[in-house]
Amino acid sequence: MNKLKLHGFNNLTKSLGFCIYDICYAQTFADRDGYIAYIDDEYNADRLTEILRETCSIIGANILNIARQDYNPQGASVTILISEEAIDPRDVDTSEHPGPLPDSIVAHLDKSHICVHTYPESHPTEGLCTFRADIEVSTCGIISPLNALNYLIHQLESDIVTIDYRVRGFTRDVNGVKHYIDHQINSIQNFMCKDIQSLYHMMDVNVYQENIFHTKMMLKDFDLKHYLFNSHPEQLSVQEKDLITKRLYKEMQEIYYGRNVVEV
């Protein structure tokens, strides 16, 4: 696609959203609580902030503000407000006066921001534990959130990933013609490196006429030892290993396809 000469600012909004799932099996209630405590500490607000800072660097965005919070009993959130151009310190108002109303903050946040929220949870009786990180990178202008795709997948090593990318609005060229997208894309997969593609089964559901792209990913290889928390396959009987494997596989299939599997 040839470069466009625009009339004014690039008004397209590009949003990249991830749901990243980590799944494990904990044999006892104590192990389940231990997994949730471990994952909650592993992905606390401080670490998530560093991941998002690096994401900003990768996509070439400038950080305006960071808000972060760890929650009790578990979970964390980080939101970073970003801009396309560096901020001149002379433009920062440090005078003593009331700040902006919430409506104006939300309006700005909808333009360019990066946010992540975490959701640890567990099955009440079957030992299944899942951790979900929900990430959104939303930009306006020439910044592309797709540049951070490989970095985020590598940083948050996951069993299942669902990715949404959409382009909204339009921008106008110097001749007054509206353009609803400013780059070529037919699949999110085309922006992934080969090593990621080799690790995952992937499926696309795209709505090209609406500039909406969706990719689901699930790890190809299954090794039970990677899914056991605080235990090892050698400690389990053949029957126990088969039961746990079936439970994990069913859980992963349900999350991947977004529907519950009814056993007949």
UniProtKB/Swiss-Prot annotation:
Keyword terms, alphabetized: Autocatalytic cleavage, Decarboxylase, Lyase, Polyamine biosynthesis, Pyruvate, S-adenosyl-L-methionine, Schiff base, Spermidine biosynthesis, Zymogen
Known cofactor(s): pyruvate
Subunit structure as annotated in this protein's UniProt entry: Heterooctamer of four alpha and four beta chains arranged as a tetramer of alpha/beta heterodimers.
Modification sites for Pyruvic acid (Ser): S112
Pathway(s) of this molecule: Amine and polyamine biosynthesis; S-adenosylmethioninamine biosynthesis; S-adenosylmethioninamine from S-adenosyl-L-methionine: step 1/1
EC number: 4.1.1.50
The keyword Transcription belongs to this UniProt entry's keyword annotation: no
Protein family: Belongs to the prokaryotic AdoMetDC family. Type 2 subfamily.
InterPro entries linked to this entry: AdoMetDC_fam_prok, S-AdoMet_deCO2ase_bac, S-AdoMet_deCO2ase_core
Active site: S112 (schiff-base intermediate with substrate), H117 (proton acceptor), C140 (proton donor)
UniProt entry tagged with the keyword Lyase: yes
Site positions per UniProt: Cleavage (non-hydrolytic): K111, S112
GO molecular function: adenosylmethionine decarboxylase activity
Record's protein name: S-adenosylmethionine decarboxylase proenzyme
BP GO annotations: spermidine biosynthetic process
Source organism (scientific name): Hamiltonella defensa subsp. Acyrthosiphon pisum (strain 5AT)
Pfam families: AdoMet_dc
Catalytic class of the enzyme: lyase
Disulfide bonds listed in the record: none
A cellular-component GO term for this protein: cytosol
Post-translational modification: Is synthesized initially as an inactive proenzyme. Formation of the active enzyme involves a self-maturation process in which the active site pyruvoyl group is generated from an internal serine residue via an autocatalytic post-translational modification. Two non-identical subunits are generated from the proenzyme in this reaction, and the pyruvate is formed at the N-terminus of the alpha chain, which is derived from the carboxyl end of the proenzyme.
